[in-house]
Amino acid sequence: NIYLHNEVSTRELDSKLLLATLAASRGHQVLISDQESLIKGLVRKFLVPGIFHTKSLTPSKTKIENHKQIINSGCKITSIDEESGLIANKYDEFAKKRYGIQTLKQASAVFSWGKNDFNSLKKIYPHYLKKIYMTGSPRVDLWKPSFHSYWKRNKIQPKKPYLLVSSSFGAGFHKESVF
């Protein structure tokens, strides 16, 4: 059984569906859900132990406690950070903020987007080399030409001219210059 933690559907759901489809085609049972529901299902034994694939290993008290519950239910934790560190281009800082010794201890495997975050993780956390894998991201896989037809189906064809107003300015209001 594979449990895929989905936090922000607009950001993560397509790539989680890709992972789920590939895993299911190989005979795995896959469930995509929010973390709270998955933990409740595991703790109450409604869900059987398996792999809990989470969207980050950011070290926080809450995350560490949640991971303890997941591990105590019999699951293994794996992760790929959904935020990737690509914008700031300061992978070492990203690795220090988004990972910690305690959360790395709890994880069975950590997947990286590419060589930059992979090398930073290996350099900053050398005791966990055997857990860190350079796999790429399913979000990036969806950019490949083989998925163009997938994106065409979701394209909205406006009937009139329109104005797009973005309501997400995270990178624009970052403390430091990111570009």
Which functions belong to the PLM regions below?
Residues 2-155, 165-174:
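Active-site and donor-binding regions of nucleotide-sugar-utilizing enzymes
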Residues 176-179:
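A solvent-exposed, charged loop/short amphipathic helix patch at secondary-structure junctions
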